[in-house]
Design a protein with these regions (language model features):
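N-terminal targeting signals for export/organelle localization
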Residues: 1-51, 185
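Sequence contexts marking disulfide-bonded cysteines in secreted/extracellular proteins
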Residues: 32-38, 55-57, 83-86
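A short beta-strand-turn-helix
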Residues: 41-46, 51-73
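Solvent-exposed coil/turn segments that connect beta secondary-structure elements
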Residues: 57-59, 80, 111-113, 126, ...
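Short active-site neighborhood of thiol/selenol oxidoreductases, capturing the structured segment around
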Residues: 63-86, 92, 105
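Active-site acidic short loop of glycosyltransferases
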Residues: 69-71, 101, 144
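Structural microenvironment flanking redox-active thiols in thiol-disulfide oxidoreductases
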Residues: 86-124, 134-141
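Thiol/disulfide oxidoreductase modules built on the thioredoxin-like
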Residues: 119-126, 134-185
């Protein structure tokens, strides 16, 4: 397993903190899947994702990570300013498309500009939903020193696997999907 990759250049100083109506045409053009609706009453006794709410990058409601249940989940923490994140985005986009209906993919875009994040996703035809963490809260809550980091979460909300660093290729992601979620692609 690779180690956490430190910030590659860092975030842009101008962070977007709320949905910008000027981005509506770009959001529509990118066509991200809607953000997932969470369970209204997740069982707090089950150890799993932190109870933190992030704004949806595309259309859809804000998302409380601890409430996303019901389907196996792959969470990728990324940023448009992160070269390893850019390198792995096509791998994630392809897997999300191939496994639609079997596995939910959710990106957590950290310390980024919405426009840059949307343009990156558009460039790779990545349409899986992403949420926005402008303040980098997920770093503290999930012990992340820098993106990318990928988490594998069972349908009932328990984190069963974590990969620090960029996913090198489809075959490696496929191995992780089998190991942690029992899902073949």
């Amino acid at each position: 397993e690779t180690k956490d990759i430190a910030d590659a250049g860092g975030p842009s100083p101008a962070l977007t903190t709320s949905k910008n109506p000027d981005l509506a045409p770009l959001i529509e053009r990118v066509g991200l899947e809607p953000c997932p609706l969470g369970d209204d009453d997740p069982d707090a006794a089950i150890p799993g994702l932190p109870s933190v709410t992030f704004r949806c990058l595309g259309d859809g409601p804000d998302v409380n990570l601890s409430a996303v249940r019901g389907t196996p989940l792959v969470i990728n923490v990324w940023a448009s300013w992160c070269p390893p994140c850019i390198a792995e985005m096509p791998i994630l986009a392809s897997a999300a498309a191939d496994l639609k209906g079997q596995v939910q993919f959710l990106g957590v875009d950290i310390e980024d500009r919405d426009s840059a994040a949307l343009m990156m996703m558009e460039g790779f035809d990545a349409d899986f939903p992403s949420v926005v963490d402008n303040k980098g809260e997920i770093r503290r809550l999930m012990a992340i020193s820098g993106p990318p980091v990928t988490f594998f979460v069972k349908e009932f909300g328990v984190i069963v696997g974590r990969h620090n660093g960029s996913l090198p290729d489809d075959a490696y992601l496929n191995q992780l999907l089998i190991r942690y979620l029992g899902i073949r692609r």
